[in-house]
Amino acid sequence: MLIQEPGWTNALKFLIVQYGQVGVSIFFIISGYFLVDKTFKRRRIFKTWFQMFCYSSGFFITLLIIGAFYKYPTVIQPLMQGSELFRTIAASFFPFFYGSYWFISAYILMLLCAPFINSLRQSLSKRANLSLLVLFSFLSIQILIFGRVSNWNNLTYAIFGYLIGAFIKKNNTEISKRMRTAPMLAGIVFMTLLMLLFNYFASSSSPISSALGWTNQIHNGIALFPIAIGTFVFIIISRINFDRVPELVSGTIVGISSTTFGIYLLHENIFGFRILWEYVSKFCYAPDSLLLRIVSAFFIVIIVFLVLSCIAKIIDILFVHPLTDKILAYFMK
């Protein structure tokens, strides 16, 4: 958790954190784009939930076995003793209800709502669908007006992304004509600068930022902007002719992208991020030069991503997918 302090350096740190929501937004948008015309399938929901359950409970069971022979790492010892152990068990075996993975939980709820959203969209005119997007846009920034009322949560976030993806799918031709790449890139830069400025003023504890309630909103920032940036990025990428991309590159991208759920489940596990970054900090030392710090941080992130991708691939192939197929074959014949 970042400590809120005044200054541009702190504002930049929070900007990096907020930019993580761009990837989340793109995932929700992709879901709406591809599922708007699809029929409801229980299998899709079960597969998502079961993968989350396998990673969450499997991590806990693995640590229990290791703990029988070796001492737990210092960073997770508090989670495995006393009253905290009960919460750890609940988080590991009931991840959906405990909120262990907010993104996956929101995604599952979005899938459950998808058939109703699709029916609603079909009954609405294009103007009404646009009005619905405007309504959700307002909900995302409502908290920034005096900081007292918010109707924005993980589910509304997921549904908003779904609605955007569905709107793009249904109006793809018109969007391609009206939304040019250069203005969208300029919009991304402009919104990024506004996010940075917001973080600076929100952390300054000025009378205006305090009166508007911004001092308590620096972590989430302007929630609408990462969604808008994610929308622009999705539209720009969708225009790329992937037939011209070398087969090796496209195959690698597809292979890595198939493990993104697993990477998230490993890293965001209550044990995962603690153990991972504890050992990364032990083996990696921060250089004195700022430039070298940035370069080394970049390579550390890439290496961690690739390592987690390989681990997730192994877990999925050896355990998750075979178990999922057997359960579905038995119960959903």
Task: Please place each PLM-identified region on the residue numbering.
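Membrane-proximal cytoplasmic C-terminal regulatory module of class A 7TM GPCRs
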Residues: L276-A286, L290, I315-K333
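Alpha-helical transmembrane segments and terminal signal-anchor/GPI-anchor hydrophobic tails
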Residues: I175-G262, E268-F299
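Alpha-helical transmembrane segments of integral membrane proteins
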Residues: R43-Q51, W102, N129-L132, N153, ...
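Hydrophobic membrane-embedded alpha-helices
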Residues: Q51-G82, F86-R87, A91, M110, ...
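Alpha-helical transmembrane segments of multi-pass membrane proteins
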Residues: M1-Q4, L64-I65, N199, E268-F271
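Specific transmembrane alpha-helix
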Residues: G23-K38, F103-N118, I141-K177, G221-R244, ...
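Interfacial loop-to-helix transition and helix-capping segments at the boundaries
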Residues: A11-V24, A90-A106, L144-G161, L196-F232, ...
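Transmembrane alpha-helical segments and their boundary/interface "anchor" motifs
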Residues: V17-S25, S31, L35-G99, M110, ...
